[in-house]
Amino acid sequence: DPITAALSQRAMVLGKSGELKTWGLVLGALKAAREEQVTSEQAKFWLGLGGGRVSPPGPECIEKPATERRIDKGEEVGETTVQRDAKMAPEETATPKTVGTSCYHCGTAIGCNCATASAPPPPYVGSGLYPSLAGVGEQQGQGGDTPRGAEQPRAEPGHAGLAPGPALTDWARIREELASTGPPVVAM
């Protein structure tokens, strides 16, 4: 991609291989953010490139002026964003509607006594469906056998490995490496 080519050419001309590593981290992190469907603002925050923001950007962080002023026939009229939003909001409120209110026992919709007439379930008596786990901890220290599954290495966070599901990016590790190795990075 053209950004990577330009950065690598600049690093070669200036002779700064550390800069290549830094920008490689940034590009890799942004690619991972794209794959994880993270917004660019959120990725910038995680990388510490948010321009001094303390909290992650979100809908509540969007800066809006407290009042908007407009001039009507020489008069200044102040209108708060709350008043403006109230004007634009639809008047009808959504009421929750219940769908399929019929009884699953008898099929009647109104006047069913099935739920109130049914007896409570019998108490649990330990039917023996599951084997007892008593003594399992005692067996661990004895014998040279490793427990089943212990021989498989676990995948580290942020690295694709044997872990099931999609691997997530370790943003804290990337931010630490950027802070320690890289040149000062200006907010994008």
Swiss-Prot record:
- Bias category Basic and acidic residues: which stretches? 77-90
Report motif location: PPXY motif. Answer: 121-124
Region (Disordered) residue ranges read 77-99, 130-166
Q: Which UniProt keywords apply?
A: Host-virus interaction, Viral budding, Viral budding via the host ESCRT complexes, Viral matrix protein, Viral release from host cell, Virion
Gene (UniProt): ev-2
A single Gene Ontology CC annotation of this entry is: virion component
Q: What is this protein called?
A: Gag polyprotein
Which InterPro entries does the record associate with it?
Gag_M, Matrix_HIV/RSV_N, Retrovr_matrix
Instruction: Cite the source lineage.
Output: Viruses, Riboviria, Pararnavirae, Artverviricota, Revtraviricetes
User: Where is the site Cleavage?
Assistant: 104-105, 115-116, 126-127
Q: Which GO terms describe its biological process?
A: viral budding via host ESCRT complex
At the top level of its lineage, which domain of life is listed? Viruses
Q: Does the keyword Cell division apply?
A: no
**GO molecular function terms listed in the Swiss-Prot or TrEMBL record:** structural constituent of virion
